[in-house]
Amino acid sequence: VIMNCCRYINRTNFEIELLVGDRVVPEYADECERLGIQIIRLPLKHEYTRQYYVKLFKILRDKKYDIFHVHGNSAMVTPDLFLAHLAGIRLNLVHAHNTTCDYPVIHRLLSPFFRLMYKKGLACSIQAGQWMFGKNRFEVLHNGIETGIYRYNQEKRKEFRKKIHMKEEFLIGHAGQFDAQKNQRFLLKVFAQTAEKQENIRLLLAGNGPDFEEIMDEIDKHPYKERIIVLGDSSQMDYVYNAVDLFVLPSLFEGLPLVLVEAQAAGLTCLVSDRVSHEADLSGNIEFLPVDSTDVWENAIKREICKKEDRQKKSENAQKRILENEYDAKNSVLKLQKIYQDLSEEFGNVRREI
């Protein structure tokens, strides 16, 4: 989402700097450098919390940004907003990306203060906005994608499957941060149960995150570890979607994940946790399943293995519906630009530094 903004925003009118308190994908860092966008690295927020806030305040005080646009999942962004207020930044935007968080009690305690701290609330979906902002007003800004990149391409499929040594095997794909929310441990259980009876299936995991090492340890002990491929972070997700035959996302909670929009654009059927916003079904190719039963997921995978579908046609139809529903990256960024412009004009800012 942030990278699409960096790619398509009018940099004649807007200057962007990224303040990052997490690990940065190297390919994204390289792209930002090519685009002339500075990434200011903060101490890792979850490991060095005090140092993170100290450095954040110094930067906000020195830079005096016109707009401070915060991405988060809960009212735990309140300290960031408070520091921006102390630093004299008047235009604070909050962008919600999830429908719950790891610390819901703290979220509820901070919510009354949080809702006094921002000028504009944005959300990737209605459910995410309701979770984050309660009865306060917010605007839905869809997580747009570059639709053309994800269009199904047989040559990309052949190339990537050759790269990962896949022939005619049925390849199940998953992409997401390795953490409790994305529920990879449940997925590994489902795969073990399904692989026991289906010799021709494989599992591909793309992503990284705080639980990466622990999940890798579980894979090492997995009865079918030789059938599991771990990519880590990948800048070739368009190739990944083309290579796989089915996409799975058993998350414990989500707003409207970008990976689901991308997977649908590539003509994939997606098996998705029923805790994910149903707004994510843009193509009619999503099946929502409970995450308390491995049997249900196993049966759904079996059904997909037996299907013979025209991926090219599915991709074309899905792309039309994605565009109709305004999930195109360029349109999303144009909408965000308008939000920035309106706020700047309303509050008299002219530099438009974000």
Roles of regions detected by a PLM:
Residues R151-M166, C306:
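A short helix/loop element that forms part of the nucleotide-sugar donor recognition site in Leloir-type
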Residues N4-Q51, P210-D211, I339, F347, ...:
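N-terminal strand-loop element at the rim of the active site
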Residues V1-N4, F170, H174-Q193, P210-M216:
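A conserved mid-protein helix/loop that constitutes part of the nucleotide-sugar donor-binding site
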Residues D211-I215, K225-S234, V240:
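Active-site donor-binding acidic/aromatic loop of nucleotide-activated sugar
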Residues L19-V20, T269-S273, H278:
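Short hydrophobic beta-strand element within catalytic cores of glycosyltransferases
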Residues E309-E353:
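A charged, aromatic-enriched C-terminal amphipathic alpha-helix characteristic of glycosyltransferases
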Residues N73, D233, L252:
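Aromatic "clamp/platform" in nucleotide-sugar-dependent glycosyltransferases that forms part
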